[in-house]
């Protein structure tokens, strides 16, 4: 005799606070993981990070990004390591406008420092990352002569000798390696077509590589914590126009201005986003990529967050946003095909390509009434005013099509709507077509607002 489970008698089991925290975290980062998969990130970091003992933590984080399907190009710097090599050789070098004049002794020191650093980085990736979340992961790192360089030459009477600039990046070979699931590692050295070696800057190599690859992100992990505003507060987001204006003002520190100049150059060359984040904060690259506000400064071509009408491309993001609220009964479950059918009714808030809020307007023109449905804001952005913005946007859409009233059906957010001008109504106040669809088992409250 077949056993029929008594599912109707099974009470839901509430998760522990730790379990709920984990579920909430995973739901919050899932849209980012989906959006960043198969995207190309060029990540530049200075030798100062290695000297500070942060290489192991960074490699662990990079391995995690790689495992999530992101294409990674790493560019390391080596200035403090070059200084150590010069000290061993009892050699002093000259800096002009922050650029080292690389004589023969300095070039040998740069080669030695870059070679040792490259081997240290490769060895760290090859250790199977013991005692980390990526323990046992097999990660291939490739290096090569991907960078063609040219001399800086003589500038204002100063011969920079073996100091160089990037002439060309072998983007095709790098892309081939990335497509084969390799991490590409570049050093701050380049070679001319005749085989002459040049000492380069990490920032120049990273910027030109990101431009050549049309990378989705250029990320500098540096001693600079980010870009500060005029009162010393971190600017989490900047448009490229604002970044250029900050450079024109001339009030930034020399190091900050240096990085920002390279960021602007990269974005003018086709890079979509750029980040400046501190290496002193353990896990800063993960926090920057997977937290809404990040921990450094992100620069984009336009303002990162904007409210717009939804398209079919947004259906997946809306589904991810509303699924948790459907699961706990806050929202009525919606089939994906119905979302696709009704997508023109939806408005969304997008931030860096991720959907963080949505709401829909269903008009009933005969009665001059509209229903606002599916008002949802991501948990990590609640309290920032996004719900208010969506409400005002839906009200504006309703007025634009001649509606006089707006109603919502809710079981849990009554007071939020009452504070914003809605009043209690009855099922009889609903348009006839909507009244026929009212769910008497759910018994949602009807709230109405005059527009």
Swiss-Prot record:
Its EC number is 2.3.1.1. Its main location: cytoplasm. GO terms for cellular component: cytoplasm. It catalyses: L-glutamate + acetyl-CoA = N-acetyl-L-glutamate + CoA + H(+). It comes from the Bacteria. Pathway: Amino-acid biosynthesis; L-arginine biosynthesis; N(2)-acetyl-L-ornithine from L-glutamate: step 1/4. The keyword Amino-acid biosynthesis applies. NCBIfam families: N-Ac-Glu-synth, PRK05279.1. This is Amino-acid acetyltransferase. It comes from Ralstonia nicotianae (strain ATCC BAA-1114 / GMI1000) (Ralstonia solanacearum). The lineage of its organism: Bacteria, Pseudomonadati, Pseudomonadota, Betaproteobacteria, Burkholderiales.
């Amino acid at each position: 005799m077949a056993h029929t489970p008594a599912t109707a008698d099974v009470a839901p089991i509430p998760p522990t606070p730790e379990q709920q925290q984990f579920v909430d975290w995973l739901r919050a980062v899932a849209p980012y993981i989906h959006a960043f998969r198969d995207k190309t990130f060029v990540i530049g970091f200075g030798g100062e990070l290695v000297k500070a003992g942060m290489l192991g933590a960074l490699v662990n984080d990079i391995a995690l990004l790689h495992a999530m399907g992101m294409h990674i190009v790493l560019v390391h710097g080596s200035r403090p390591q070059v200084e150590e090599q010069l000290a061993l050789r009892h050699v002093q070098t000259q800096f002009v406008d922050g650029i080292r004049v690389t004589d023969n002794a300095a070039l040998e020191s740069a080669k030695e420092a870059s070679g040792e650093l490259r081997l240290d980085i490769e060895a760290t990736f090859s250790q199977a990352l013991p005692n980390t979340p990526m323990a046992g992961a097999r990660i291939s790192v490739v290096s090569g002569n991907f960078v063609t360089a040219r001399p800086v030459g003589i500038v204002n009477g100063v011969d920079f000798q073996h100091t160089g600039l990037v002439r060309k990046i072998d983007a095709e070979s790098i892309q081939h390696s990335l497509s084969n699931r390799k991490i590409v590692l570049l050093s701050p050295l380049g070679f001319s077509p005749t085989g002459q070696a040049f000492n380069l800057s990490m920032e120049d190599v990273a910027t030109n590589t990101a431009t050549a690859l049309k990378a989705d992100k250029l990320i500098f992990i540096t001693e600079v914590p980010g870009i500060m505003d005029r009162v010393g507060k971190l600017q989490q987001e900047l448009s490229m126009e604002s970044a250029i204006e900050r450079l024109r003002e001339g009030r930034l520190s020399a190091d900050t201005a240096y990085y920002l100049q390279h960021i602007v150059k990269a974005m003018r060359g086709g890079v979509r986003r750029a980040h400046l984040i501190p290496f002193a904060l353990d896990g800063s690259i993960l926090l920057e990529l997977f937290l809404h506000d990040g921990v450094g400064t992100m620069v984009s071509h336009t303002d990162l967050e904007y409210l717009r009408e939804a398209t079919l491309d947004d259906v997946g993001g809306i589904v991810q946003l509303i699924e948790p609220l459907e699961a706990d009964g806050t929202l009525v479950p919606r089939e994906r095909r119905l979302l696709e059918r009704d997508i023109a009714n939806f408005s969304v808030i997008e931030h860096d390509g991720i959907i963080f809020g949505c709401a829909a307007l269903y008009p009933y023109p005969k009665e001059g009434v509209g229903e606002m449905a599916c008002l949802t804001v991501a948990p990590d952005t609640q309290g920032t005013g996004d719900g208010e913005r969506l409400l005002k946007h839906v009200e504006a859409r309703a007025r634009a099509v001649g509606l006089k009233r707006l109603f919502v059906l809710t079981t849990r957010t009554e007071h939020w709507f009452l504070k914003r001008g809605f009043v209690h109504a009855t099922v009889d106040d609903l348009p006839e077509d909507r009244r026929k669809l009212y769910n008497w088992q759910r018994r949602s409250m009807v709230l109405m607002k005059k527009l």
